[in-house]
Amino acid sequence: MWPQARLPPHPAMAEETRQSKLAAAKRKLKEYWQRNSPGVPAGAKRNRKTNGSIHETATSGGCHSPGDSATGIHGESPTSSATLKDLESPCQELAVVPDSRSVKVSQLKNTIKSLKQQKKQVVHQLEEEKKANNEKQKAERELEVQIQRLNIQKGKLNTDLYHTKRSLRYFEEESKDLAVRLQHSLQRKGELERALSAVTATQKKKAERQFSSRSKARTEWKLEQSMREQALLKAQLTQLKESLKEVQLERDEYAEHLKGERARWQQRMRKMSQEVCSLKKEKKHDKYRVETLERSLSKLKNQMAEPLPPEPPAVPSEAELQHLRKELERVAGALQAQVEYNQRISLLNEGQKERLREQQERLPEQEERLQQLAEPQNSFKELNNENKSVLQLEQQVKELQEKLGKERLEAASQQKQQLTAQLSLMALPGEGDGGGHLDSEGEEAPRPIPSIPQDLESREAMSSFMDHLEEKADLSELVKKQELRFIQYWQERCHQKIHHLLSEPGGRAKDAALGGGHHQAGAQGGDEDEAAGAAADGIAAYSNYNNGHRKFLAAAHNPADEPGPGAPAPQELGAADKHGDLCEVSLTSSAQGEAREDPLLDKPTAQPIVQDHQEHPGLGNNCCVPFFCWAWLPRRRR
């Protein structure tokens, strides 16, 4: 990985070169001596054998060589003095070399040790640097991975922002379309109210003819029912009185019977206690007699067991012996009879204890029977109170009937005028055309609220007015039923969509989100995170549809909150105002064709809506669906 550091040349290397040069010089000297001398001296051979190192042999040979050579020269052949001088100078140098060599060796060892330590330090530093570099590389890799993840998340967030912007644009377009449809639905509502007012006017005339016969039949039927109820109540009262008398007699008899039984049991208890006391006394007396008899028996046995005196006593007569035997037999029989008597008395005591326990267990049952006998009296009191309340109600009914007769006689003169005025006012919305309703909405005065006439002229007018109110109530109930059906249909659709979004990962979840096909332009990869995001969008739309609906209703209503001429009265539309979370919007013919092609209409939740549209063709040719369901339906781009 890293380049090795180049160290400067150490002085030990120069020393090695010197040693190599010295060795070469020694070799040359040896060769020179071998050439000049015919034979090697014996001292040199011995020194070579004893000293193992080459340096010592060389020094010894170099030191003694001048003398030996001189002797050899003088003995064998004469040599020149110049050569001897030349040889003495290198010998002196060779003698100085061993001392300097040992010093250099020690220095070299020290330098080697220091170099080894430096090498270890350098290796340690290199390892630490390698570890630090590895850690830095790991940190750099982790940072690169995190940067990649952040880039991926950034891309996902950008795609989500793009989809949310598109969905917001889509909902803005939908809101505009829904505002237009709300205006159309309000117009249609005004037309339907006009038709209803015309229908009510025609039905009133029919109801006026039938009210007289109906009212008479109702009053007669109510009177007959009241008479029957009175007869039944009287019969029930008589039966209850008789049953009360019987119950009271039974209760008195049972109380007397209980008193007699209590007295008998008390007498028996007293007798038993007296018998127990007498038995205890007899038992004590019998115990005393048994003890006396036992003492007498022990005395007799002792007398029989005593040894005869040395003097011959007087022999008892046979009559005395027989008398003693008879007494013993009599005492034994009396003891057996006493034991049997005691056993009988213990058995009797146990039986009496069991009877006492049974009587104690029966006492709470008898008390409960007494309480049950006392309950009919309470029920009789309650029935008397109910009968009194019924009589009071009958009196109140009679008084009310009398008051109604008087009011009918007094109101006969004023009813015709009010009915004619009401019929004229209610017939006004039906006379105008439906096309100019919106144009003349601000100029026409609001339709008056149909009020209940205070003074009624005849029973026919009363019946017509009541029938009119009943029809309005029926219509409000139908509206409520339709709203409930739409709510159920919407909830089931939303649950199906959310389940579909959560169960199917990938690109389908985005296609099934709010907006239908408008979200198909996104990324086609389709991860599970994107499916979960689309499901979350659907859930958020499902939870917040009420707020959006109220905003659209506020924008579609009149700014001054004044009803138009074809608008319903506030009293008639109270139920519709309470259910402000729902609103029916008519769709165009193109949307109707698409809805027919939609396979969701084959489901059981969508069938009631189609059936209502087929059963009521007069309500319009366009099918109606709550506006918050429109976002889930396939939408055609106009």
Curated annotation (Swiss-Prot):
Keyword Coiled coil: yes
Keywords carried by this UniProt record: Coiled coil
Start and end residues of each stretch annotated as Disordered: 1-84, 427-453, 510-532, 556-575
Listed Pro residues bias regions: 1-11
Biased composition annotated in UniProt, kind: Low complexity: 561-574
InterPro entries in UniProt: GM130_C, GOLGA_cons_dom, Golgin_A
Compositionally biased residues, Gly residues: 514-525
Coiled coil: 105-160, 223-275, 318-417
Entry GO terms, CC: cis-Golgi network; Golgi cis cisterna; Golgi cisterna membrane
Origin: domain of life: Eukaryota
Polar residues bias locations: 50-62
Biased composition (Basic and acidic residues): 434-446
Protein's GO biological process: Golgi organization
Pfam family, one: GOLGA2L5
Family from the record: Belongs to the GOLGA8 family.
Protein name: Golgin subfamily A member 8S
Organism: Homo sapiens
